Regions:
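Conserved, well-structured core segments that form or line functional sites
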Residues: 144-146
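Assembly/oligomerization scaffold segments
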Residues: 1-140
Length: 146
């Protein structure tokens, strides 16, 4: 019999708690105008977040096993936002949470879709790459000497 997972107990190194992983289109909607986004946590296979002292932005990727035709129904164009909140088990203070939600004002932005593979007629696997707002700002801003 499996033991229940407790939110306050670290099960293994690198353990984290993720309540939801919500993708929102450029209109701030999910599949239709009545939804505020689509929770894709159950479609997620892998989540990676990268930050470095020599990088000016946070980047990451999420591997999706798509059984609901998310690409076609949303559709994914590269202008979507990805919202989520991570916490280490046992961390309850706001200072210990990693908050990339719409409410905090710092959602991630999807900028690329790679490694798309059709597994079966109704299942495909792909990787969504996301970044912080600063990454997009650095790409779009041109600095010139006057």
């Amino acid at each position: 019999m499996a033991t229940p997972v407790h939110d306050d107990v670290i099960e293994f190194a690198g353990d984290y708690r993720l309540k939801s992983l919500v993708i929102t289109n450029h209109k701030g909607e999910g599949f239709d105008s009545t939804q505020r986004g689509v929770d894709i946590k159950r479609l997620m296979t892998e989540l990676n977040i990268y930050e470095g002292i020599y990088k000016s932005a946070i980047t990451g990727s999420v591997v999706i096993t798509d059984t609901i035709n998310l690409i076609g129904r949303l559709p994914i164009q590269g202008t979507e936002r990805l919202s989520f909140k991570l916490a280490t088990p046992g961390a309850h203070e706001a200072a210990h949470l990693i908050d990339f939600t719409e409410r905090s004002g710092h959602p991630m932005h999807i900028y690329k879709l790679t490694d798309r593979q059709q597994i079966s007629e109704s299942v495909q696997v792909y990787t969504l790459h996301f970044c912080s707002r600063e990454f997009l700002r650095n790409i779009r801003t041109k600095v010139s000497q006057s």
